[in-house]
């Protein structure tokens, strides 16, 4: 850092300190704020709680300060909600007031400051984007149209694993093949495209760029520059990398997928009724002037992250729990054999006849929630919550993982026990009918991808279990299920090697 930058930084810190003290005194008189650790000027609670605001750390703070508490992270207010009643207020009762999204400096880059659907503020743009995305992605008609493709992709996974001699011996990192499956599931819907193998050069490039985007966005290491704007110059290099990755991804989406589809469609006559895949609907909306080219690319961006990676995380967690609980794995296999008969491969319509498999999926989503804090909410204006004043533009985090793992609300929540969803919690569904269990959120800003994720999870886990005995690698009794949290993600830290011993029918 040169001397001039240092002088400017120190001067800025001094001015920020005076401003923070003045604002704090004014707000203290005006607002009845939620409880929380006592902040210090400039830094707020950042030096006390650190960067890693994962679900478990926030749970520990909730045990100290209550079901609603406030963290002042530099200039940002974070309100954390940890009870079903308050979650209902945020997501349902006051869904409009808290219906916007807050973005940080990195998500501003990757979403074009909210030109997408997931991270835009609540308003006309969000309603338009949600409407445009619903028809080609999030309806029962889409499920019925594409479930054959999902079943075909799952069958290809089974065939490839059977042919791999390492699978039944030392084991393989099954996630790698499942990642290809998930890309094919979603790229069939988006572009009527698929990748032939893990070595496909375009798939390799796409996977690498998406992985780098996720790493950069989910990291906690840039929080200091987001919380304390005067420190943002120190993020210059980090943000430069983010911008480069963003531009490369959007260019790849445009050159290899969107433009290719437009060329294909220009060679034939297509009516609205004949549209084959999602991008056709989206490009039609662009032609009508409802959205622009950037919006089209950010829709593709959302699907690459929100649909592919999150479902893959849940599949990986489900496999790990089944490997570590062989008695549960056997119950799933026995149910499939008994209900469908040996050799009849699980299909999407079969899921309704397989309650124990459904319970395993629910339990995976409860204990290993892919988005444990949901996607953060924000109130555009001053609001009330739980008897407290919530300043405008506060970041609202709903600790959905703790709602689903609080022993005050669940029987032995630390156990992986699918039976709970057939016994004492048999009424609970993943669609948000119970505010203790919100793996996809609920209300206006809930995840519409639930309609795709649940059948894909069922088909994938069902076919793996009915075709293989899934085991830890030689020398291990269990898989390592250590967690890796992100800004609001939860996935397994180590991609485990799995032994898959084929069954004979």
Curated annotation (Swiss-Prot):
GO terms for molecular function: heme binding; iron ion binding; trans-cinnamate 4-monooxygenase activity. GO terms for cellular component: membrane. The chain crosses the membrane at residues 3-23. (E)-cinnamate binds at residues 213-218, 306. PANTHER family: TRANS-CINNAMATE 4-MONOOXYGENASE (PTHR47948:SF4). Its main location: membrane. It is an enzyme of class 1 (oxidoreductase). SUPFAM superfamilies: Cytochrome P450 (SSF48264). Belongs to the cytochrome P450 family. Pfam families: p450. Induction: By fungal elicitor. Catalyzes the first oxidative step of the phenylpropanoid pathway in higher plants by transforming trans-cinnamate into p-coumarate. The compounds formed by this pathway are essential components for lignification, pollination, and defense against ultraviolet light, predators and pathogens. It is found in: Membrane. It catalyses: (E)-cinnamate + reduced [NADPH--hemoprotein reductase] + O2 = (E)-4-coumarate + oxidized [NADPH--hemoprotein reductase] + H2O + H(+). The lineage of its organism: Eukaryota, Viridiplantae, Streptophyta, Embryophyta, Tracheophyta. Pathway: Phenylpropanoid metabolism; trans-4-coumarate biosynthesis; trans-4-coumarate from trans-cinnamate: step 1/1. This is Trans-cinnamate 4-monooxygenase. GO terms for biological process: lignin metabolic process. Its cofactor is heme. It comes from Glycyrrhiza echinata (Licorice). Gene3D superfamilies: Cytochrome P450. It is a single-pass membrane protein. Signal peptide: none annotated.
